[in-house]
């Protein structure tokens, strides 16, 4: 038994090391890639200081943090709702953040500062997450809870479409493209949003013990002495915060929170002591690679990153649905 435990521990360490190397390679590629490829040897030239340090570095850091936040949010929601298909985008949390942001633009008539828009996006994500938690407490089946989340997402999407369609504000119309997901407008002025993600990410990665208990189910967690009400509300707040900040930074980006935790579990990373940091590393790597594809796919334009992640993630999601139905 001890030998098996040591083998599993070594395998987990190897996975985390591989994911760390993958993330570093994706980060370096993201700093080099663009209309003008700039190799590391030219990073400190006048051209490199402009393109790498002023334009690409803040964007790359934002992509890295948002990818980590979305993947960890997916893992947390799957444990919270005891639902392997739970994910911020699929359950409407990302769209809720978008509704909060668009409501702030409408009510503030475009005069609100960026920090206020970010807080409204966070509030919208929290409201949808709390509604989903109320549904989960009614012991709905997996399929019904999933349908409830999809319905909430459709309602939020409809509200955003109506608001944008009837608006005469140029800023609000530009939000429609922004809600498809993209990091094109990110620079050092959004560094406060990046900093707002870091402490929550680090805190959740340290909460493997209650997460492992939650993954066992509500009855088992209670028997083990876990204060369910406290941890559910704290994790809901943390998840809503991460999703809201991510939407404020880059718009709605789907499938990262669904696919990454599933792939890691299939690879044997079921313990949240390894799964949570693994999700952070894999989510950051996946979104960095998707952002590189979005930047390089078209010569004179940039694809919305939400389109890239949906194109790559939708087939995986269908496969997971078929596998869950067997």
Swiss-Prot record:
The keyword Secreted does not apply. Belongs to the binding-protein-dependent transport system permease family. FecCD subfamily. Gene3D superfamilies: ABC transporter involved in vitamin B12 uptake, BtuC. This is Vitamin B12 import system permease protein BtuC. It is a multi-pass membrane protein. Part of the ABC transporter complex BtuCDF involved in vitamin B12 import. Involved in the translocation of the substrate across the membrane. The complex is composed of two ATP-binding proteins (BtuD), two transmembrane proteins (BtuC) and a solute-binding protein (BtuF). The chain crosses the membrane at residues 15-35, 61-81, 88-108, 112-132, 146-166, 184-204, 240-260, 274-294, 302-322. InterPro entries: ABC_BtuC-like (IPR037294), ABC_transptr_BtuC (IPR023691), ABC_transptr_permease_BtuC (IPR000522). One of its GO terms (biological process) is cobalamin transport. GO terms for molecular function: vitamin transmembrane transporter activity. Keywords: Cell inner membrane, Cell membrane, Membrane, Transmembrane, Transmembrane helix, Transport. It is found in: Cell inner membrane. The gene is btuC. HAMAP family: BtuC. GO terms for cellular component: plasma membrane.
């Amino acid at each position: 038994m001890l030998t098996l435990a040591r083998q599993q521990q070594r395998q987990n360490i190897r996975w985390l090391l591989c994911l760390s190397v993958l993330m570093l390679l994706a980060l370096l590629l993201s700093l080099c890639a663009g209309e003008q490829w700039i190799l590391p040897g030219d990073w400190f030239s006048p051209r490199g200081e402009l393109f790498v340090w002023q334009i690409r570095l803040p964007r790359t850091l934002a992509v890295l943090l948002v990818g980590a936040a979305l993947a960890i949010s997916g893992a947390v929601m799957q444990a919270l709702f005891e639902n392997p298909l739970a994910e911020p985008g699929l359950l409407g949390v990302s769209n809720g953040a978008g509704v909060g942001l668009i409501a702030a633009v409408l009510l503030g008539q475009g005069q609100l500062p960026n920090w206020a828009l970010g807080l409204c996006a966070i509030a919208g994500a929290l409201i949808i997450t709390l509604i989903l938690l109320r549904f989960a407490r009614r012991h709905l089946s997996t399929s019904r809870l999933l349908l409830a989340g999809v319905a909430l997402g459709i309602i939020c999407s409809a509200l955003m479409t109506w608001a944008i369609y009837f608006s005469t504000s140029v800023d609000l119309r530009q939000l429609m493209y922004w809600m498809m997901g993209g990091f094109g407008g990110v620079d050092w002025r959004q560094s406060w949003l990046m900093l707002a993600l870091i402490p929550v990410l680090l805190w959740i990665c340290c909460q493997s013990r209650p997460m492992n208990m939650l993954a066992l189910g509500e009855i088992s967690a209670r028997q083990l002495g876990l204060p369910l009400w406290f941890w559910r509300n704290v994790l809901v707040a943390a998840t809503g915060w991460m999703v809201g900040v991510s939407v404020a930074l880059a718009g709605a980006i789907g499938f990262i929170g669904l696919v990454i935790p599933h792939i890691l579990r299939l690879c044997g990373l079921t313990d949240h002591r390894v799964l949570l940091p693994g999700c952070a590393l894999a989510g950051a790597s996946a979104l960095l690679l998707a952002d590189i594809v979005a930047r390089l796919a078209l010569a004179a334009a940039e694809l919305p990153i939400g389109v890239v992640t949906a194109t790559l993630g939708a087939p995986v999601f269908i496969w997971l649905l078929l596998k869950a139905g067997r």
